[in-house]
């Protein structure tokens, strides 16, 4: 199997059908569809039993609610494909997405490439983050973001073995981990093959994670701190390192187990970020109390 299209699902029965239809319309069928249901309380289980297809394998698994990143870890364990393509339950693919991915895989030049990456578009056809002038390039994700100054979410397709080597950290008392943890870890070891073609349609919903991300991070401070501490140690602009340490302290004040802080090596200058982090934490608390 060449590709695993992986969908973590939680109470998205009203959008999954659109994704299913887009998969059936693919011009190249060389994939399986793997769904991990993260404890949905709507009719997602019943709906997924109807997604039988003579075109491609459909596999459905239901797990106890632990959050999207835990579902991704489970999906990587179960995947049969060489490449792992995370497609959220409220998004869908253009008809030629898998055809384009198949063609781009054949154009990979470096053995260090661990990720294929195309563009995400809004339903209107506009690229998320604005238009770009390049055709294709192989580089680290850090170079692509900060040297080429590319903005906006992208559509990453990762070698399954690479995902398995860089699983998200999980904690029994937390249900969230920033997706940047996975991609930063991969970028330190692997190149990405970028190509300037749309392979993903994205629509941000008002009940999605991005709509209430501050509250979510406050409720999962351990994973959030890991993200910001690791990001600050990456080859990123100094301004981003400063913001990372400010956010490290900001969400560190949400920790119930203060001993968790001992696992981090905090540079001396990062203590200057303590006060702005505390001020942002106070603002977050006041903002949440008003809601």
Go through each PLM region and give its residues.
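Short, well-formed alpha-helical segments that are part of the catalytic scaffolds
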Residues: 11-25
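Short beta-strand/loop segment that forms part of the nucleotide-sugar
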Residues: 30-39, 59-63
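Glycine-rich, basic loop-to-helix element that forms the pyrophosphate-binding segment
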Residues: 63-79
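Catalytic core of nucleotide-sugar-dependent glycosyltransferases
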Residues: 198-205, 212-239
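Short aromatic/hydrophobic "clamp" motif used to bind/position activated sugar donors
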Residues: 84
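Conserved nucleotide-sugar donor-binding catalytic segment
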Residues: 122, 126-211
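A conserved acidic beta->alpha catalytic loop
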Residues: 22, 37-47, 88
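Conserved donor NDP-sugar-binding/catalytic core segment of glycosyltransferases
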Residues: 96-130
